[in-house]
């Protein structure tokens, strides 16, 4: 694989940027990641995200939307529990004006009560809509973090948000702009486009990010936990590693893929052999700093609980014998070249890698590190996960 078109650099304001130039393509993708420690009222950062779409200098929401439409490119944004991300993909000839629009949105400082009253009903409806879905497994995973700042709701409570002080909203907004800001650009961009990034995002005043120590919390350590009642069960098996190192963080994606992705994955083969023919097994992992939570979720009837739970130990042992490399390498290593031709996916991949490592990671770094994985090495990392704090949740319906 040729990574000569990939570049990592520091902007003069301290922000990090990774770029991947592909002059044979017709599109350019751009993403900006704004990390934060969720110290404020739950939902405030999500509120700030909505406000960013209300004003951009003299332009109001209708004019912002009209500009995006005229270029055939929509700026999207989302808020996670620990960062905010904005991204877009467009034709090369409209990249610079679209970049300037996003920069103007994010550097807007003044908002009116009218702006706030426009976004609150949208947020209220978003919360209302999310309540229609059974998100209890996700709620359980949120609650597992030992630092409770990361277990708060991203959307928040609309009634509480209606009364949040303007000063708190402004303070949360300012806390986004630190030297941990990361920019990712990929595709057919020119030198003039890079200079535009320097002249816009490279000129935003950034401060050092203060990361307060984790709060000491009461920890849920019971091996078996029940949530709700009913004859249908979601079984959520979780593993919690407190001091995950660089290798384990890099290996987590490979382990999840080998164990749970596709019908030839280890979990499907094991549980099928034990009489459980699952349509899907939802394997997942999340990383916050040095905490890693690895999990999988299956659906069973309540009467099958006594047969399934003893298999959790058996799966841990069977998974050690997985042919990890043959299952995963074609997808996660050899298929990295697919990203060369898809700027939007490449920028999303950079964001995912940043989320896992809490730092920007180039494709070359990922390929060089993960390309040397062996079955024995990946099995050892799985053993480390399997021997960490395990908690099983029976979520009834």
Predicted feature locations:
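His/Glu-rich zincin catalytic helix
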Residues: 1-64, 170-270, 390-397
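Charge-rich, well-structured scaffold segments of protease-associated domains
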Residues: 57, 63-210, 241-243, 251, ...
């Amino acid at each position: 694989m040729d990574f000569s078109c990939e570049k990592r650099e520091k902007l003069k304001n301290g922000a990090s940027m990774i770029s991947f130039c592909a002059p044979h393509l017709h599109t350019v993708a751009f993403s900006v990641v704004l990390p934060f420690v969720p110290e404020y009222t739950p939902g405030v950062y999500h509120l700030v995200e909505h406000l960013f779409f209300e004003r951009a200098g003299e332009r109001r929401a209708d004019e912002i939307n009209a500009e995006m439409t005229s270029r055939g490119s929509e700026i999207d944004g989302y808020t996670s529990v620990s960062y905010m991300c904005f991204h877009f993909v467009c034709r090369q000839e409209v990249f610079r004006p679209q970049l300037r629009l996003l920069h103007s949105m994010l550097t807007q400082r003044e908002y009116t009560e009218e702006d706030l009253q426009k976004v609150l009903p949208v947020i209220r409806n978003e919360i209302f809509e999310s309540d229609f879905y059974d998100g209890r497994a996700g709620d359980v995973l949120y609650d597992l973090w030992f630092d409770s700042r990361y277990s708060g709701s991203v959307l928040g409570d609309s009634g509480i948000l209606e009364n949040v002080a303007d000063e708190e909203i402004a303070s949360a907004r300012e806390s986004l702009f630190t030297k941990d800001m990361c920019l990712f650009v990929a595709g057919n961009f020119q030198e003039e486009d890079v200079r535009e990034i320097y002249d816009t995002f490279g000129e935003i005043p950034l401060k050092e990010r203060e990361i307060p120590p984790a709060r000491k919390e009461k920890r849920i350590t019971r091996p078996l936990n029940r949530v709700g009642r009913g004859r249908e069960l979601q079984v959520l098996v979780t593993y919690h590693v407190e001091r995950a190192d660089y290798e384990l963080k890099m290996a987590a994606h490979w382990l999840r893929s080998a164990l749970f992705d596709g019908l030839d994955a280890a979990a499907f083969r094991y549980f099928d052999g034990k009489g459980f023919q699952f349509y899907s097994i939802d394997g997942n992992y999340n990383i916050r700093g040095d905490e890693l939570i690895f999990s999988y979720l299956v659906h069973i009837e309540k009467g099958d609980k006594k047969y399934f739970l003893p298999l959790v130990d058996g799966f841990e042992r069977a998974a050690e014998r997985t042919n990890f490399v043959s299952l995963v390498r074609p997808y996660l290593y050899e298929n990295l070249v697919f990203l060369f031709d898809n700027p939007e996916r490449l920028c999303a991949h950079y964001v995912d890698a940043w989320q896992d490592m809490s730092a920007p990671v180039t494709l070359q770094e990922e390929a060089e590190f993960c390309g040397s994985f062996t079955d024995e090495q990946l099995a050892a990392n799985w053993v480390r996960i399997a021997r960490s704090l395990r908690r099983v949740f029976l979520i009834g319906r």
